[in-house]
């Protein structure tokens, strides 16, 4: 989200045909430096991220009412409701000096038909039925799933959670769906984690390492 705010529309650039090019990373260079500096500032300048806090600690503190806000997704809402947390959904503000709004990576769940199925036609028809607006509304009401169908969102527009996420989603970018994404996750995480752990960490070196 922070990398997108500072200019990286995705992890990878696109080629002339509009396909993701795994040889061209967008999260390094000046974009990476600014994003990492902001993350570092959250910890050491603004003191908004306490020392030693990871997702588990932050999530637990939010459920206990000891944390004012958390960056999270629809998957966490069930636990928050069980903990009786009075919460709302809102886009993260644009970081200082950012050229774009903050935006998360987006992913969707789908229905997959087995290529070896003996009843492909019936399976496809069933899959199409599952993703109709009416059934997506039913999935939301039964399990809190956030629909991507505009017609379903329209039907649920009075639901504050659905309404909140519907304002966040347009700001996001699709999660890269190429195999090379998995190879970036580890080094990216290893390179960015120290920004909130060490006040002397060189944020200019990390983006260079990502591009190496």
Give residue ranges: language-model regions.
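Short, flexible turn/loop "capping" segments at secondary-structure junctions
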Residues: 14-16, 102-106, 186
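Short helix-initiation/N-cap motifs at beta->coil->alpha
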Residues: 49-64
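Extracytoplasmic/secreted proteins, especially bacterial periplasmic and envelope-associated proteins
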Residues: 1, 31-41, 57, 75, ...
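Conserved C-terminal helix/tail region of periplasmic/extracytoplasmic solute-binding proteins
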Residues: 171-212
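Extracytoplasmic/periplasmic substrate-recognition and gating elements
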Residues: 33, 41-46, 50, 81-145, ...
């Amino acid at each position: 989200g922070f990398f997108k705010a500072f200019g990286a529309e995705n992890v990878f650039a696109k080629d002339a045909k509009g396909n993701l090019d795994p040889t061209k990373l967008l999260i390094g260079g000046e974009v990476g430096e600014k994003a990492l500096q902001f993350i570092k500032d959250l910890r050491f300048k603004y003191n908004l991220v306490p020392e030693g806090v990871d997702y588990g600690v932050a999530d637990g503190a939010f459920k206990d009412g000891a944390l004012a806000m958390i960056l999270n997704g629809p998957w966490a809402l069930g636990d928050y409701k069980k903990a009786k947390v009075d919460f709302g959904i809102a886009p993260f503000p644009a970081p200082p000096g950012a050229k774009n709004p903050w935006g998360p990576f987006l992913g969707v769940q789908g229905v997959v038909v087995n290529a070896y199925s003996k009843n492909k036609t019936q399976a496809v028809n069933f899959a199409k039925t599952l993703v109709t607006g009416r059934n997506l509304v039913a999935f939301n009401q039964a399990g809190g799933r956030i629909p991507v169908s505009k017609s379903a969102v329209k039907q649920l527009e009075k639901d504050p959670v659905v309404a909140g996420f519907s304002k966040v989603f347009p700001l996001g970018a699709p999660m890269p769906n190429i195999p090379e994404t998995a190879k970036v996750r580890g080094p990216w995480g290893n390179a960015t984690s120290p920004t909130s752990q060490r006040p002397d960490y060189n944020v200019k070196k990390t983006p260079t390492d990502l591009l190496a």
